């Protein structure tokens, strides 16, 4: 199992200072000293996908690859919005559509203070948003039948415009197949859609 992410450059870190210095060098027509350009990063990303595929690591989520049968069960449960309880200081949980986390203050945690912090009962809209933008991170996509079972409204009715737009742009595809309780439609991001997933997934957030 391999998780492959591009490095996020955060402010107030040595990498951020180096990246800023590289930007000045690039602007002057020079060769960066520290970090690759966006174009180089995309080539590295493409090469990573190809090398992993050659060695039997199939992509099952935007940034995760595994050999068959070795997908991370914890992560899959997270993307499918299954219940999970976080154990430990600062750990997050999702239980019966309520999100919360443990204290991140060591003194309080050592007193066995297990009071929920920042508890949020998710609205139906928030649940539908999470269903889409978490589920579409997986290459299996999202099931319209499961959406209906959970929310009692057709996925296509809620997200008609977003689906139409992304499919017309070649970022999303729909496939049909047999399910245990009848026919099912699954929506998946295309390879291009995965490459611009931040844009594609944002279409499923309610204004």
Q: Which sequence ranges carry the predicted segments?
A:
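Short solvent-exposed loop/turn micro-motifs enriched in small/polar/acidic residues
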Residues: 69-71, 165, 180
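Non-catalytic, well-ordered alpha-helical scaffold segments
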Residues: 126-133, 160, 194, 198
């Amino acid at each position: 199992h391999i998780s492959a992410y591009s490095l996020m450059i955060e402010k107030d870190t040595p990498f951020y200072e180096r990246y800023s210095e590289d930007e000045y060098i690039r602007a002057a027509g020079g060769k960066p000293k520290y970090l690759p350009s966006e174009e180089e990063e995309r080539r590295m990303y493409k090469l990573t996908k190809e090398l992993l595929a050659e060695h039997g690591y199939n992509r099952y989520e935007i940034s995760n690859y595994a050999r068959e049968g070795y997908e991370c069960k914890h992560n899959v449960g997270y993307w499918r919005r299954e219940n999970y309880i976080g154990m430990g200081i600062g750990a997050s949980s999702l239980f019966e559509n309520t999100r919360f986390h443990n204290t991140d203050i060591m003194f309080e945690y050592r007193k066995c203070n297990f009071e929920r912090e920042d508890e949020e009962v998710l609205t139906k809209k928030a649940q539908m948003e999470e269903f889409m933008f978490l589920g579409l991170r997986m290459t299996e996509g999202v099931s319209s039948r499961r959406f209906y079972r959970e929310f009692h409204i057709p996925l296509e009715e809620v997200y008609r415009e977003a689906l139409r737009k992304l499919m017309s742009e070649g970022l999303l595809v729909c496939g049909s197949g047999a399910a245990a309780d009848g026919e099912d439609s699954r929506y998946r991001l295309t390879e291009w859609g995965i490459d611009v997933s931040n844009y594609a997934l944002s279409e499923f957030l309610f204004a």
